């Protein structure tokens, strides 16, 4: 009876070993012809590629079963997979930058065209209407438009002060032309001091100041917002992949080839976990990115109506014409008030004597009706901004679907990182803090990428400027694309996650993947979800233990 029982134990152990060996496709030596073909198509030499599977103890990233990959092949494919992901990221970034650039150039060109058309209308209409009141002061008007362009382009000018200085200079020159025999040079100071009370140009200066401040601030903040968004995308695209990510990408994309199943495509959730871990820092841009785009959509409300950007920027000449008309209409009253305030001036010995008859008249200009161009441009821009709002958090899924040849479904035929089979771990959340338990990529959540943290700050700064511009505030526009210094005591962790969470494993400083591949970590084999058979050497150990137990059984009795 004891011999029969002992034979039963031996039979069970042997059967288990045979069944598992047959059930694991990697345990049989198979042809590597398909892998050779794929490997050669990528430009690698086939001299070291085995004809059939070999033992895989030398592998450092892929599972160490039977394999079609040598150490050199694994290294080449690891570097190649990293370059493929970097290329895919750059393609996505360039596409987003192109979208933003298209919107920026369209709207920026339109606003500048409005200002150019206004100046052109002034140059065509003012000489005939105002004669030398305009022709002798063309530089003052030209300088005004030049400063308005500088302000629109983001120059650190104070628009209200710029306009006030223009009106003061213009008053001196025009009043001197109207009364050349009354105004010696020392009389002009008093005139300037009385200008605000005298209101020589009527309501035109005040109306232009109120409307232009809001209109130009809204227009330039929107255009600058597009520029900042594009610059953030460009700088984030330059952030290198971490070594842990490079290992995970190799395992995702090419370890199936080494395993001898190149036709197995990555399981969807497996791919998402790898990319969410690789792009954890990028996902942290999401909140401030959305805030910026929302603020840009909101500021477009300031483009419409009588005080809107299109009406005001394209109608600067209208307010200038009204100002000169008011000065001519109120010439006599204004002269009397100036004499009352400043006294009777001495006759200017260099004056032109009695006023000569000059060709002067009134100019009635109407604002040009909207062509609908800006409405179309803004409508397209708002639609594009809404489409790209979730760019950073949707990037892993987009890359998996479009670049990683992801399997359409998670089933027994997709690649789970170890073999063909279902992928069981849950998909991680978005952002750095949610990667603490990522089963595919080791992420140190206490070490955020500083370049990306700086870009998050740039997004915040630009959003605050847009919100100020919505209220009509003249914000100080520095170059928001400049890199921040990164100084300060904060480590950059969002909220208080650094205090609440601890990394699974403290990693060394991140450097680009070199040709020397790191060794397989002790946890690598534990990060599997498939219910696969253990390697054959495990069953040999089980088999020996079973023999010992069976042999010792009579003695226990």
UniProtKB/Swiss-Prot annotation:
The UniProt entry lists the main location of this chain as membrane
Record protein name field: Glypican-1
Post-translational modification here is noted as: S-nitrosylated in a Cu(2+)-dependent manner. Nitric acid (NO) is released from the nitrosylated cysteines by ascorbate or by some other reducing agent, in a Cu(2+) or Zn(2+) dependent manner. This free nitric oxide is then capable of cleaving the heparan sulfate side chains.
Spell out the GO cellular component terms annotated for this protein, sorted alphabetically and separated by semicolons.
cytosol; endosome; extracellular matrix; extracellular region; Golgi lumen; membrane raft; nucleoplasm; plasma membrane
Q: Which residues are glycosylated?
A: 79, 116, 485, 487, 489
Top-level division of the source organism's lineage: Eukaryota
Location in or out of the cell: Cell membrane; Endosome
Question: Where are the disulfide bridges?
Answer: 32-68, 62-255, 69-258, 190-342, 245-278, 267-414, 271-400
Provide the leader sequence positions.
Answer: 1-23
Membrane topology, record value: Lipid-anchor; GPI-anchor
- Region feature (Disordered): 477-531
GO BP, sorted A to Z: heparan sulfate proteoglycan catabolic process; myelin assembly; negative regulation of fibroblast growth factor receptor signaling pathway; positive regulation of skeletal muscle cell differentiation; Schwann cell differentiation
Q: Where is the lipid attached (GPI-anchor amidated serine)?
A: 529
Q: Which residues form the propeptide?
A: 530-557
**Gene it is expressed from:** Gpc1
Q: Name one Pfam family in it.
A: Glypican
A Gene Ontology MF term for this entry? laminin binding
Q: What happens when the gene is disrupted?
A: Null mice with induced pancreatic ductal adenocarcinomas (PDACs) exhibit attenuated pancreatic tumor growth and invasiveness, decreased cancer cell proliferation and mitogen-activated protein kinase activation. Pancreatic cancer cells isolated from the tumors of GPC1 (-/-) mice were not as invasive in response to fibroblast growth factor-2 (FGF-2) as cancer cells isolated from wild-type mice.
Q: What does this protein do?
A: Cell surface proteoglycan that bears heparan sulfate. Binds, via the heparan sulfate side chains, alpha-4 (V) collagen and participates in Schwann cell myelination. May act as a catalyst in increasing the rate of conversion of prion protein PRPN(C) to PRNP(Sc) via associating (via the heparan sulfate side chains) with both forms of PRPN, targeting them to lipid rafts and facilitating their interaction. Required for proper skeletal muscle differentiation by sequestering FGF2 in lipid rafts preventing its binding to receptors (FGFRs) and inhibiting the FGF-mediated signaling.
Which family, according to the similarity comment? Belongs to the glypican family.
**Organism listed in the record:** Mus musculus
Q: Which UniProt keywords apply?
A: Cell membrane, Copper, Disulfide bond, Endosome, Glycoprotein, GPI-anchor, Heparan sulfate, Lipoprotein, Membrane, Proteoglycan, S-nitrosylation, Secreted, Signal, Zinc
